[in-house]
């Protein structure tokens, strides 16, 4: 039946072709040939090219205006007005030929120029040389790396630790090692730039909550819980992370960790804790914000910190359960594809840990000095102190902005410069303004170390007050 129908249709088509007018057939034939020509012909011919005359060439050359190799830079750009630091950035440092008390460098425990740390680094240099010439998985693992990881794990009372050769890359590599596309990350709006880069690399769904606002975080968690109920199948494969800092780099405030742990278990999320400022600072033994609050470290899924603030070294580490850390050895980009930490810096970090364990009273001394200068800087007309009294790095911001960020920066820089002239070394907090998700207001960052005496702290506070009054009033 189907064959007969097809034959009948074919007969009808042939009959219609015979009955069609001649002009109709000619037009369709021309169109078919034109389509074939368009399909197989080139859009241009190499031979069809007209050469410019000498006069036309000269006119084009005269009209051409080359772009500058380097864009114009204003004379007040920070890159053109730099300070020259001579010697190590220890308790006192020489800036532009003048000895200053250093309130700018992250050297909380004063170990940068510690003789024991220097001796350990020198001995390692003589034994191993300078570098390792490869990543950890490609002949870049030395025994001193394994010793440092073991010491860090024991110090933090975790199962295992992993070290990175660059502090910034530690949390920036750890986050995308676990959080992938489709996962959800709840992160504080004041998170540091390293966390932001890690989130960007993860390509996860990012939800920002107000700084240290647990009510706002719970609101977001509840909203996500409602979304999960609409699609249970998707929810089963979607992981939820909460990323916070122990002490926030951009605000100097401490995270409310006990409340975060409660929300973690209530809404089945994982906590990543960045402790670059709180490690070696908070807690009776310097173990960070978990020890400060008395929280079981197993309640935190991953702890990250750099070794550049308290340990007088370079690099960073992550610690936690063994299965969490082992995953980074194959998935942590900064671990797999960067040359490993130079052995001399690993040896320096081990010796710094020895000093911390032998002298736990150093943390109480640091806390006392932080409180002293924090109190002394209160009540400065035109400036406000931003940060906790126990934080060794806090900010001085303008009480009222001028309405222009550039003008605010200039005012604060004038304060910094005049303090420098009076032998107090300070610095502004610097940001990549176009890259920051939530750009903090301009500020002067003040960093405290255990080596600063009470007299030096009082002198710094009085100098800042006098200079601020002269500049702002």
Curated annotation (Swiss-Prot):
Localization (cell): Endoplasmic reticulum membrane
InterPro entries linked: Aminotransferase_I/II_large, AON_synthase_class-II, PyrdxlP-dep_Trfase, PyrdxlP-dep_Trfase_major, PyrdxlP-dep_Trfase_small
Modified residues (Phosphotyrosine): 164
Membrane-spanning segments: 16-36
Regulation: SPT complex catalytic activity is negatively regulated by ORMDL proteins, including ORMDL3, in the presence of ceramides. This mechanism allows to maintain ceramide levels at sufficient concentrations for the production of complex sphingolipids, but which prevents the accumulation of ceramides to levels that trigger apoptosis.
Reported induction: Expression at protein level is highly increased in brains of patients with Alzheimer disease. No changes are observed at mRNA level.
Spans within the Lumenal topological domain: 1-15
Record topology, Cytoplasmic segments: 37-473
Outcome of mutating residue 387 to A: Does not affect catalytic activity towards serine; does not affect the interaction with SPTLC2
PTM section of the record: Phosphorylation at Tyr-164 inhibits activity and promotes cell survival.
EC numbers on record: 2.3.1.50
Enzyme class: transferase
Protein name from the UniProt record: Serine palmitoyltransferase 1
Cross-referenced PANTHER family: CLASS II AMINOTRANSFERASE/8-AMINO-7-OXONONANOATE SYNTHASE, SERINE PALMITOYLTRANSFERASE 1
Keyword annotations of the record: Acyltransferase, Amyotrophic lateral sclerosis, Disease variant, Endoplasmic reticulum, Lipid metabolism, Membrane, Neurodegeneration, Neuropathy, Phosphoprotein, Pyridoxal phosphate, Sphingolipid metabolism, Transferase, Transmembrane, Transmembrane helix
Catalyses which reaction(s): L-serine + hexadecanoyl-CoA + H(+) = 3-oxosphinganine + CO2 + CoA; octadecanoyl-CoA + L-serine + H(+) = 3-oxoeicosasphinganine + CO2 + CoA; tetradecanoyl-CoA + L-serine + H(+) = 3-oxohexadecasphinganine + CO2 + CoA; dodecanoyl-CoA + L-serine + H(+) = 3-oxotetradecasphinganine + CO2 + CoA
């Amino acid at each position: 039946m189907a064959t007969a129908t097809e034959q009948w249709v074919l007969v009808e088509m042939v009959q219609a072709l015979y009955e069609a007018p001649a002009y109709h057939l000619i037009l369709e034939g021309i169109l078919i040939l034109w389509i074939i020509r368009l399909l197989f012909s080139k859009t241009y011919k190499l031979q069809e090219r007209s050469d410019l005359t000498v006069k036309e060439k000269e006119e084009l050359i005269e009209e051409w205006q080359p772009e500058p190799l380097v864009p114009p830079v204003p004379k007040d750009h920070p890159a053109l007005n730099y300070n020259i630091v001579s010697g190590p950035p220890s308790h006192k440092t020489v800036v532009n030929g003048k000895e200053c008390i250093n309130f700018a460098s992250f050297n909380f425990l004063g170990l940068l120029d510690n003789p024991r740390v220097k001796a350990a680094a020198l001995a390692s240099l003589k034994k191993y040389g300078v570098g390792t010439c490869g990543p950890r998985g490609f002949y870049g693992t030395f025994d001193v790396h394994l010793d440092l990881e073991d010491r860090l794990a024991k110090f933090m009372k975790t199962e295992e630790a992993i070290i990175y050769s660059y502090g910034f890359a530690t949390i920036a590599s750890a986050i995308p090692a676990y959080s992938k596309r489709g996962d959800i990350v709840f992160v504080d709006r004041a998170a540091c730039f390293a966390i932001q880069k890690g989130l960007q690399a993860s390509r996860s769904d990012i939800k920002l909550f107000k700084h240290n606002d647990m009510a706002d975080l719970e609101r977001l968690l509840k909203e996500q819980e409602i979304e999960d109920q609409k699609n249970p199948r998707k929810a089963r494969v979607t992981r939820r992370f909460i990323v916070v800092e122990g002490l926030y780099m951009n605000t100097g405030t401490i995270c409310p960790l006990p409340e975060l742990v409660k929300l973690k278990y209530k809404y089945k999320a994982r906590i990543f804790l960045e402790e670059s400022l709180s490690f070696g600072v908070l807690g009776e033994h310097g173990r960070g914000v978990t020890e400060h609050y008395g929280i079981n470290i197993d309640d935190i899924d991953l702890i990250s910190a750099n070794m550049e603030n308290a340990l007088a070294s370079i690099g960073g580490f992550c610690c936690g359960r063994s299965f969490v850390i082992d995953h980074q050895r194959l998935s942590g980009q900064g671990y797999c594809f960067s040359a490993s930490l130079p052995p001399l810096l690993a040896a320096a970090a081990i010796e710094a840990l020895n000093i911390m364990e032998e002298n736990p009273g150093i943390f109480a001394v640091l806390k006392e000095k932080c409180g002293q200068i924090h109190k002394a800087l209160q009540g400065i007309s035109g400036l406000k102190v931003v940060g906790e009294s126990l934080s060794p790095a806090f900010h001085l911001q303008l009480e009222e902005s001028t309405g222009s960020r550039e003008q605010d920066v200039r005012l604060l820089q004038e304060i910094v410069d005049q303090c420098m002239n009076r032998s107090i070394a300070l610095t502004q907090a610097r940001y990549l303004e176009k890259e920051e998700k939530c750009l903090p207001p301009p500020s002067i960052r003040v960093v405290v170390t255990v080596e600063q005496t009470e007299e030096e702290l009082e002198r710094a506070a009085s100098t800042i007050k006098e200079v601020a009054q002269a500049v702002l009033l």
